Amino acid sequence: MDKEGRAHFRFYAPQASKLQVDCCGKKYDMWKDAGGLWTATTDPLPVGFHYYFLIADGVSVTDPSSYTFFGCCRVASGIEIPEGEEGNYYRPQQVPHGQVRSCTYYSETQKEFRRCMVYTPAEYETYPKKRYPVLYLQHGMGEDETGWSTQGRMNHIMDNLIASGKCVPMLVVMDSGDVEAPFRPRLGKDINEERALYGATFYDVILKDLIPMIDRTFRTKTDREHRAMAGLSWGGHQTFNTTLPHLDKFSYIGSFSGAIFGLDMKTCFNGVFSDADGFNKRVNYFFLGCGTEEQMGTKKMVESLCELGIKVDYYESKGTGHEWLTWRRCLKEFLPNLFKH
């Protein structure tokens, strides 16, 4: 990468006849020298994390010389265009570091073994009798349970906020939302009904399998006052569908660029928003955020909720779209408000 934010790619493939780099929605032709080394330079790229692919003779593949991530419904390569010092909140600093643990468990509802990722704060092993609140944090469509701790830098955000005293120590649990495959509505079916089915298997998993397993395995505070849920994009959709019908289990709710469409705020989820006083008393903190450059309808939703008297904290990430930089910023704004009521 150079100081103008352009990425320079080099790839050795002497037998390939055509190579391209697919990055940030644009395909760049690569040029081959006499020794079989291909090179390409991109336009200046926006800051933040971006997926990219190599296209070798028409076949899209990952870059074997870089780290891989699960995104775009497949294994992908990724590139980080660095911010300035304003991005230090998601970078590792000289502070105590927590752990991200990979946990395998059996889901009775799905009759399968599953994996979740669990962040424990740096002090977790130091205080063996202390119990912790829990945030359940969901990825978006086409990603999986690793997204928040790799693309999202969640663990560094947590470490830095806890060390600065802005955030209480907590566990963060990340599971697959069962939305790794693309959303493909069936022909002739109502689009909103099809959306309701996409990833719906996860709702019983989190309520009947995941939460009980976490409470058995880790030292958690098990009441609703110490349980939160948030998610990005389709994870925001899943957060609404999990928490709003089950406010007996959650008291903190967050949606980052939530894929929440076609809802009548007065009647959705059995009219949960129609009783503003009741909702505001039960939900300790309600957060909605998005980027200024995306069109997810979040701001209009906030306006509708405010008209009904719902207390909601709204955040806009300036200059960003439907991307990980937006969601990192949303998480940074959301976390300091948890478990302080």
Positions of predicted regions on the chain:
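Non-catalytic cap/lid and distal C-terminal segments of serine-dependent acyl enzymes
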Residues: 1-28, 32-341
